[in-house]
């Protein structure tokens, strides 16, 4: 044995030693040339970066082994890694913000322009049919469209009041024109309005047109307003949600992920994909918007389908003039019956002296120029678009948004600055401590799974307060859109009192037909208070605007709104309350 010892000593240097372990790149590569090159290009002073590895006992985040970073360099890299992460998150979601903002602008412009087109069409129709008579009373019609725009823009009163006042003013102007031989002082017109607004519906001077016009306009404008508000809410919520605050634990994990390879002198060694996913999911764990985001997108699509279907904004806007014209034709054709009722209730009017008497205006057929828009002739705006095209474009873009928050960590880690390509899983990568393979388990993004995140401590109580508030905003917008799709206004006005609450507009197709059978009348409501001051005249003293087809939310709708508000209140408590 003693004779073999010299031979063993000669062979020992030829035997291979142990393979490189974690941190061995510091022993193999003692130069900081690559780090100096990368950081120098970023504007770092080379005086702060040593040419070779030094002791890392001064480091606070990176492993305290051999390093190329001073304390100042490490702190600067921490700030840069935070900025890189924030920028990637915002860039990943920028298409959401831009898409929702662009769709909001396009739909808003379209709805407003369709109202302008409807006003222009009515002006042309009535100018040709009534000529000078329309010109004398054009302010009534212009006022109607102005108040419709105010309601759509959230600055006007309810549509019931708007339409009731319009029909009242129209009756007060038109009825004297049918009887130029009589004088109708203000007191008599007040009696006329009171009679027309009586709850028994005995006098319907414009037939069923006011009810059908109110039903169409209210359901359509409520839906359009909720839809545009929903797009605006989504844009604001996403814009705020993408501004991710970085906690101290997240900041340190990001530094270990993409900053520490520079300090170890191996900037070309990319972080492992699993390492990146754990860090990013931990940083985003309390700030996702699912599942409320998916429900919000569903609400947009449901309401968009209604707006190009049973609640068609195009057909509603284009039919305003038709419904008003039908009402005027009904009054002319039934003037004898209507006048007899008025004269019986309000008394015979005083005759006009013969020298002041005007000739009656010619009766012309008001609707002769009108032709309904066919499927092949969808009205377009000045921009050459129509609602069908806008909804198709919206549907295509919303499909790309679905699941965005669930995929956000994969999107961020797919950037070359954050992690190695997932296809290179078998190749060595940066594990947080050195070169090798990432062995800890990759956890999911839910709060329950993030409790076991190996890279940073995550609050298991769920979303933070700002995120809960944003999710509640999405829930409120979704509830408003889905309620509008059922023909109701969540803000308090019942937009669909003549249709079933569960049908959401199944009766609406009948309302397009002139002369459609009206649904059964509801129980009479108490008369409305006077809308303007005035002393009593013939037929009674109180004043009341004509209110044909006008109604407030009844008991059924009150229960509907109470239930919806209760659901939102419970959602708020669930989101904002303690976990």
Curated annotation (Swiss-Prot):
Tell me, in one coarse class, where this protein mainly resides. membrane
Q: Which InterPro entries match?
A: Glypican, Glypican_CS
User: Residue positions of GPI-anchor amidated glycine lipidation?
Assistant: 554
Q: Write out the annotated subcellular location.
A: Cell membrane
Q: Which residues form the propeptide?
A: 555-579
Q: Where is the composition biased (Pro residues)?
A: 520-529
Q: Which UniProt keywords apply?
A: Cell membrane, Glycoprotein, GPI-anchor, Heparan sulfate, Lipoprotein, Membrane, Proteoglycan, Secreted, Signal
Which stretches does the entry tag as region Disordered? Answer: 444-468, 485-555
Q: Name one GO biological process term.
A: regulation of protein localization to membrane
Q: How does it sit in the membrane?
A: Lipid-anchor; GPI-anchor
| Cystine connections | none
GO CC terms of this entry: cell surface; endoplasmic reticulum; extracellular region; Golgi lumen; lysosomal lumen; plasma membrane; side of membrane; synapse
Q: Which domain of life is it from?
A: Eukaryota
Q: Which residues are glycosylated?
A: 55, 92, 155, 500, 502
Q: Does the keyword Acetylation apply?
A: no
Question: Which positions make up the signal peptide?
Answer: 1-23
- What does the protein in this record do? Cell surface proteoglycan that bears heparan sulfate. May fulfill a function related to the motile behaviors of developing neurons.
**Family to which the UniProt record says this protein belongs:** Belongs to the glypican family.
Oligomer and partners: Interacts (via heparan sulfate) with PTN; this interaction promotes neurite outgrowth through binding of PTN with chondroitin sulfate of proteoglycans, thereby releasing PTPRS of chondroitin sulfate proteoglycans (CSPGs) and leading to binding with heparan sulfate of GPC2. Interacts (heparan sulfate chain) with MDK; this interaction is inhibited by heparin followed by chondroitin sulfate E; this interaction induces GPC2 clustering through heparan sulfate chain; this interaction induces neuronal cell adhesion and neurite outgrowth.
* Name of the protein in its database record: Glypican-2
| Protein's organism | Homo sapiens (Human)
Please spell out the taxonomic lineage of the organism that makes this protein: Eukaryota, Metazoa, Chordata, Craniata, Vertebrata
